[in-house]
Structures are given as structure tokens and as C-alpha cells.
């Protein structure tokens, strides 16, 4: 595995593989790798000649009161895990490498960001698409891999790829979970022992809401109540419970089509997000 920190090194390696017409799978991350990231890397390994992973904690996607400085980092461990997952090139730039000067041009996302996490984190997705635009130009991937735990991010990136005619395929991978259902996340390390025991309630609550809809419940207020019940028994504070069309992230006139139930819950030092995405048959549509 090649570990590179400078853009010129990365571009030279990518050029060598492009000349051989190799397919390139790209897994962008902020590091502190867990099984979710490694699943993305393994998918990329199975589907491409070359696998590139980036580790970059992007300051543009953190708000003024968020955890940029304290975001967990362990580069030595990350390098070992990336190598074991079959990564060929690990790109680990610092902030000065990616933003040599204060950016004179950044991206602005106009749709799909005024709900869910974007509602409480203004500018977050602008930072995400700005850094991804840079990374996509540098890596020139055939396929780029993202986890559906961050479903809003996947929806925004999907729109960005289409709007800017990036010649790449977005591969969205189902959320990787612990045995008790908790979505794997770098921020899970912030949970106390008690909070860690409570946290699986998020997924149980989401599945309860999904089950109710699949069994015919169409009263949205009742679905919210069902999802809320399990969370209220924890020490977490509900940030949001929302139901939208997916990937458009628009309010539903009726519960039909591709639907997302998404949730965010704040514990003492961790804000956890999770979701379920599923198809709801329209009236008269046959179940498959």
C-alpha cells in the first residue's frame, strides 16, 4: 500500500493506473476507521483494479461549535486497517495541502440540505461537496463508495455528481451495524457505558416505524409517536425524527414510493444519526 500526503504524489500514481486503463474505486473518509469504512473498501476491492482511500478531517464541514479539534484520529491504526482491507493508495493530506490558502471558491448546495442534519448544520454540506469536488478531480474514480448511514450526504452527493456531470458511479452501501443494531460510527467512542447500552434503541425505533407503515399505518403523527416511544426511554435528547421521500428529501403528500425515516439523537458527548430506507407500494400497486 502506498501512503501519500502530497497532491503531486497522488496525481502521479493515478496517472500510472489511468495509462493502464485500470478502473479506480474511491473511498473518501475522515479516518478513525471502523467496520463501515472497511466494508466500503472491501466492496471497492471486489469491483475495481485500484482502490484509493482518503483520510482527511475536513474543517469546512464542521460548524464553529462542533468537534473538529476533538474528532477522533489514529493514523497508525487507520493505515493498518486500510492495508488489511485491500487499499492500494492511502491519501492522507493535511489541511494546508487541501486548502493552501483560504478558499476563493467553494460550493453551495441549494436543495436537499434544509432538512435533517442540514437544517441544524448550515454550511456542512457545502463543505462536503467542496472537498469531494477536489478529491474527485484528483482521484478520477470510476466508482465512489459511500455508506447509507449518512443517507442525506449520499442524496446530496448523488445530486452533485449528476449536476456537474462527473464521469463516475456512486455506489451506496447499506449501513453496517453492531450485533445489537447500533449503526457503526466513529463517534460511538464518545458514548458512556450507559449510553452505549441505550443507543440501539434508535434502530429499534426506526424498525418499529417501518413495520407500522408496511402493515398499513398511514397516520404520520402515529408513526412519529411509535418511533419516539423507544427513544424517550433513553437518556438521549431527540434532535429530529423525520419522514421524507428518498433521495429527493421532500415532504410526502402520501406515504408511497421510496421513503426514509431518519433520526438524530444527542447523548452527552455524541450526536447519533440513523435511518431506514424502504419502498412503500402506492395504492393499487402489487407487493413484490
From Swiss-Prot:
User: Which residues are named in the active-site annotation?
Assistant: 37 (proton donor)
**Which reaction is recorded as catalysed by this protein?**
(R)-pantoate + beta-alanine + ATP = (R)-pantothenate + AMP + diphosphate + H(+)
EC numbers, comma separated: 6.3.2.1
Instruction: Quote any Pfam family the record assigns.
Output: Pantoate_ligase
Q: Under which main EC class is this enzyme filed?
A: ligase
| GO biological process per UniProt | pantothenate biosynthetic process
Q: Which residues bind ATP?
A: 30-37, 147-150, 176, 184-187
Q: What is its main location?
A: cytoplasm
Positions binding (R)-pantoate in this chain are 61, 153
Q: Which UniProt keywords apply?
A: ATP-binding, Cytoplasm, Ligase, Nucleotide-binding, Pantothenate biosynthesis
The record ties this protein, via Gene3D superfamilies, to: HUPs, Pantoate-beta-alanine ligase, C-terminal domain
Other information: The reaction proceeds by a bi uni uni bi ping pong mechanism.
Name the job this protein performs: Catalyzes the condensation of pantoate with beta-alanine in an ATP-dependent reaction via a pantoyl-adenylate intermediate.
HAMAP family hit by this protein: PanC (MF_00158)
Q: Which family does it belong to?
A: Belongs to the pantothenate synthetase family.
Fill in the subunit field for this protein: Homodimer.
Entry protein name: Pantothenate synthetase
| GN (gene name) | panC
Amino acid at each position: 500500500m502506498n501512503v501519500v500526503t502530497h497532491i503531486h504524489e497522488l496525481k502521479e500514481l493515478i496517472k500510472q493506473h489511468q495509462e493502464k486503463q485500470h478502473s479506480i474505486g474511491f473511498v473518501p473518509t475522515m479516518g478513525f476507521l471502523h467496520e463501515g469504512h472497511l466494508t466500503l473498501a472491501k466492496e471497492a476491492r471486489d469491483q475495481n483494479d485500484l482502490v484509493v482511500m482518503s483520510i482527511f478531517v475536513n474543517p469546512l464541514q464542521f460548524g464553529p461549535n462542533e468537534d473538529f479539534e476533538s474528532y477522533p484520529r489514529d493514523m497508525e491504526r487507520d493505515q493498518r486497517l486500510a492495508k488489511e482491507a485491500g487499499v492500494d493508495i492511502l491519501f492522507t493530506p493535511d489541511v494546508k495541502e487541501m486548502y493552501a490558502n483560504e478558499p476563493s471558491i467553494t460550493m453551495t448546495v441549494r436543495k436537499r440540505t434544509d432538512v435533517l442534519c442540514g437544517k441544524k448544520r448550515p454550511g456542512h454540506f457545502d463543505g462536503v461537496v467542496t472537498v469531494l469536488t477536489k478529491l474527485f478531480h484528483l482521484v478520477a474514480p470510476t466508482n465512489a463508495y459511500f455508506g447509507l448511514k449518512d443517507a442525506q450526504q449520499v442524496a446530496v452527493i448523488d445530486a452533485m455528481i449528476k449536476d456537474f456531470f462527473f464521469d463516475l458511479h456512486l455506489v451506496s452501501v447499506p449501513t453496517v451495524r453492531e450485533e445489537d443494531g447500533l449503526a457503526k460510527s466513529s463517534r460511538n467512542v464518545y458514548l458512556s457505558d450507559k449510553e452505549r447500552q441505550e443507543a440501539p434503541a434508535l434502530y429499534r425505533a426506526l424498525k418499529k416505524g417501518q413495520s407500522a407503515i408496511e402493515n398499513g399505518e398511514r397516520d404520520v403523527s402515529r408513526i412519529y409517536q411509535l418511533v419516539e416511544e423507544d427513544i424517550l426511554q433513553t437518556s438521549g435528547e431527540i434532535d429530529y425524527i423525520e419522514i421524507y421521500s428518498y433521495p429527493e428529501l421532500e415532504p410526502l403528500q402520501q406515504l408511497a414510493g421510496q421513503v426514509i425515516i431518519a433520526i438524530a439523537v444527542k447523548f452527552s458527548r455524541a450526536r447519533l444519526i440513523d435511518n431506514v430506507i424502504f419502498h412503500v407500494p402506492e395504492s393499487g400497486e402489487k407487493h413484490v
